[in-house]
Amino acid sequence: MLNRREAFAGFALTFGAVSFGLTTTAAAQSLTWAPTALTPAQARTVDAAAELVVPATDTPGARAVGVPQFIDRALGGWCDPAQAKLLREGLDGLDADAKAAHGAAFAEMTSAQQTALLTRYDDVRAPQRRFFALLKELTTIGYFTSKAGATVALRYDPVPGDYRGCVPLKEIGRGWATT
C-alpha cells in the first residue's frame, strides 16, 4: 500500500524530472535559425560567444545582426579548411572546458562564467588563443559588414567628403563605414 509520504516523494521526483526535461528542451531549441556548417551545439556556442564579443548596448549586438549565421555561412563557404577545423575544434573545446569547470555547456552558463572562460582563452599564453582570435575576427567582420553594424555602430555616408589624411579622432568622431 502506498502511503502519503511515498506519494509526495514520487510526485516530487516526477515533477523534477519533467521540469529538467523542459529546461533542457528549451535550451536545445534556443536557436531561431538552422545551422548548415556547424552542429546545433556549436551554433549555440557561437551565438553566446559572439554576443559577448559584441554585446547589445545602445547599438545592436552580434546576435541581433546575425553574426552567428554569418560565421556558419563563412565556415560552409569561404573559410580556409584549416581555419574551419580550428574553429570547430575550438568550439567543441570551449564547450568541454565549460562542462569541466561548471558542469554545463558554454551557452547554458551565466554571463559572468562565460566571460571568465573567454578571458582565459584571450590570454597570450593560452593554447586556445588562436581559436579565440579567429572567433573574434569572424565576429567583428560579420558585425561591421552587416547593415546595422555599418550604419548604426559606425556612421554611414556613401560619399564621406574630401580626403584628409591624418585627422584627430576628436575632430571627426566615430569611424566611418561604406558598404
What are these regions (language model features)?
Residues 1-15:
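N-terminal secretory signal peptides and thylakoid transit peptides that target proteins
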Residues 56:
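Extracytoplasmic/periplasmic solute-binding protein
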Residues 31, 41-48, 52, 66-179:
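Mature-region segments of soluble proteins
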Residues 60, 64-65:
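Zn2+-dependent metallopeptidase catalytic domains
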Residues 18-25:
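C-terminal segment of classical bacterial N-terminal signal peptides
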Residues 26-30:
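Boundary at the C-terminal end of the N-terminal hydrophobic targeting segment
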